[in-house]
């Protein structure tokens, strides 16, 4: 029988993992809210941010590397939108989805070519990895920092969307793309800002994830990306609060499943079983709005 401290550590671990999924899931849900596009390359942007840090930190201090990594991640996200999605804006959705999958494989194979398929050690960030004693529990500082930083970023994002001009434009475009164009809203600027925000949050998630995990490989973005996608669908894709809540639920459940040796092997399967159940029982997710097709 485990004591209370064991379950508290599991809960903290689940909240931390859920926070990382939330940061990635917001990128999925924002892009879908604006473009009705599932950006399947989003998990690979997260992976590329990890490699940016590996190579930049080899010649720069962490104080320089972290801002540079975030900047390069944002530029990568915007470049993908301009090169792979913008030319297909009026194309059938299937064409855009195939393009997104193609970009995902392109990034994976590019990383594989550069690294030779070998995992690279992530630079140590002592501020994150230092072990703290909190209430008799020995936990890494990153376990506390991750959920706090995630909540702070989500609050800032909600304020930006609700209170600023670009945020109001985003809400207008997500409601009615065609009418927003007719009303003079700069659609390209709104879409670019959406990719800037999503890629920035993926970059932050990458730093927090790999600082704790310790190494980066070309395929490592696939599973966190897919789990974040499930979180976005669970909460209601297009809903930022829904994506965050869905991510926390998945992270906590995953943590408790992994702690049970009998069913630990099914931790990944649980996430995708949950996706099937959601699609069967509540296709719009917990907080998603029912969309109507215009004819």
Q: How should these model regions be labeled?
A:
Residues 87-163, 190-193, 256, 262-269, ...:
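Transmembrane helix-bundle core of multi-pass membrane transporters
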Residues 21-25, 61-71, 195-202, 206, ...:
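Transmembrane alpha-helical segments in multi-pass inner-membrane proteins
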Residues 12, 34-79, 83, 259-260:
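Membrane-embedded helix boundary and interhelical linker motif in transport proteins
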Residues 6, 175-182, 186-189, 261-295:
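Cytosolic-side transmembrane-helix boundaries in multi-pass membrane proteins
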Residues 60-103, 110, 245-250, 282:
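Alpha-helical transmembrane segments within multi-pass membrane transporters and channels
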Residues 1-23, 52, 63-64, 91-98, ...:
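Membrane-interfacial amphipathic/re-entrant helices at transmembrane-helix boundaries
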Residues 17, 137-216, 240-245:
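Helix-loop-helix "hairpin" substructures at the membrane interface of multi-pass membrane proteins
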Residues 19, 28-50, 90-95, 166-169, ...:
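Short, non-helical or kinked segments that cap or interrupt transmembrane helices
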């Amino acid at each position: 029988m485990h004591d209370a401290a064991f379950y508290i550590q599991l809960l903290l671990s689940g909240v931390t993992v859920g926070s990382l999924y939330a940061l990635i899931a917001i990128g999925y849900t924002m892009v879908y809210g604006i473009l009705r596009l599932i950006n399947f390359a989003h998990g690979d942007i997260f992976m590329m941010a990890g490699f940016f840090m590996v190579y930049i930190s080899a010649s720069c201090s962490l104080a320089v590397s972290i801002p540079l990594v975030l900047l390069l991640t944002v530029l990568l996200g915007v470049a993908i939108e301009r090169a792979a999605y913008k030319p297909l804006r009026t194309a059938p959705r299937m064409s855009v989805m195939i393009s997104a999958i193609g970009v995902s494989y392109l990034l994976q194979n590019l990383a594989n070519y550069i690294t030779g398929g070998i995992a690279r050690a992530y630079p140590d960030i002592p501020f994150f990895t230092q072990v703290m004693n909190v209430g008799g529990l020995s936990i890494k500082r990153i376990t506390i920092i991750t959920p706090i930083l995630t909540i702070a970023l989500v609050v800032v994002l909600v304020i930006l969307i609700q209170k600023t001009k670009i945020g109001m434009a985003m809400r207008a475009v997500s409601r009615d793309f065609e009418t927003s164009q007719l009303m003079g809203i700069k659609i390209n600027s709104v879409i670019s800002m959406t990719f800037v925000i999503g890629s920035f949050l993926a970059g932050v998630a990458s730093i927090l994830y790999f600082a704790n995990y310790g190494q980066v490989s070309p395929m490592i973005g696939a599973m966190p990306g897919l789990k974040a996608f499930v979180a976005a669908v669970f909460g209601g894709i297009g809903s930022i609060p829904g994506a965050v809540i869905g991510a926390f639920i998945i992270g906590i459940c995953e943590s408790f499943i992994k702690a049970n040796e009998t069913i630990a092997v099914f931790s990944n399967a649980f996430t995708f079983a949950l996706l099937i159940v959601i699609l069967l029982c509540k296709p719009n997710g917990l907080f998603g709005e029912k969309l109507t097709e215009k004819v």
